[in-house]
Curated annotation (Swiss-Prot):
Entry GO terms, CC: extracellular region
UniProt function note: May play a role in sequestering potentially toxic fatty acids and their peroxidation products, or it may be involved in the maintenance of the impermeable lipid layer of the eggshell.
Location of this chain's protein in the cell: Secreted
Cleaved signal peptide residues: 1-19
Chief site of localization: secreted
Organism, scientific name: Caenorhabditis elegans
Keywords assigned by UniProt, alphabetized: Lipid-binding, Secreted, Signal, Transport
Stated family: Belongs to the calycin superfamily. Fatty-acid binding protein (FABP) family.
GO terms, molecular function: lipid binding
Highest taxon of the lineage: Eukaryota
Domain notes: Forms a beta-barrel structure that accommodates hydrophobic ligands in its interior.
Name of protein: Fatty acid-binding protein homolog 3
Expression sites (tissue/organ): Expressed in presumptive hypodermal cells by the comma stage and in posterior body wall muscle cells by the two-fold stage. From L1 to adult stages, expression continues in body wall muscle cells adjacent to the pseudocoelom, while hypodermal expression is extinguished.
């Protein structure tokens, strides 16, 4: 009887751990940039020139987060008026390589913990100084992205789109 209870407990914990490693449904959808807080200051802290900051701030930005057709895998798309990045078929906690919005190859890892989806990037051409993590939460049916650099915290709010992808 004790063996069955132990086996049941182990299976239950394994199932709960698996369920906790999934992105909740409320995150899935297409989101369009609505507003930003400290975005210019954040870019300046990263050393981005004034002219380039103005170009970046003018860009239309949408994010699409979806389940991939393969169970346990996901897709994230960053759609901008300048360049798109399409990260398809990634798994939580597994690092993959892809091109970032800056045109440079990145190592990227997505994780989900305590209601927060994180997207961690390391540029392959400067791994010692380039680590960045973006944190996503859902607040009032909006996707909220948080970034920090040199003590500057930036937040960007994306409204859920009612249109098709």
């Amino acid at each position: 009887m004790n063996l069955y209870l132990t086996l049941f407990s182990f299976c239950f914990l394994a199932i709960m751990a698996e369920a906790a490693s999934e992105i909740p449904e409320k995150f899935f959808g297409k989101y369009d940039l609505d507003r930003s807080e400290n975005f210019d200051e954040f870019l300046a802290a990263k050393g981005v020139s004034w002219f380039v900051r103005q170009m970046i701030k003018l860009a239309k930005v949408s994010k699409v987060l979806a389940k991939n057709e393969t169970p346990g895998k996901y897709n994230m798309e960053n759609l901008t008026s300048k360049k798109n990045t399409l990260y398809h078929g990634w798994e939580l906690g597994k690092t993959f390589e892809a091109e970032g919005l800056d045109g440079v190859a990145h190592k990227i890892t997505f994780s989900f913990k305590d209601g927060v989806l994180s997207e961690h990037h390391i540029r392959l051409n400067d791994p010692e100084h380039s680590a960045e993590t973006y944190y996503y939460t859902i607040e009032n049916d909006q996707l909220v992205m948080k970034m920090v650099n040199n003590g500057i915290t930036c937040r960007r709010w994306f409204k859920r789109s009612t249109g098709k992808k």
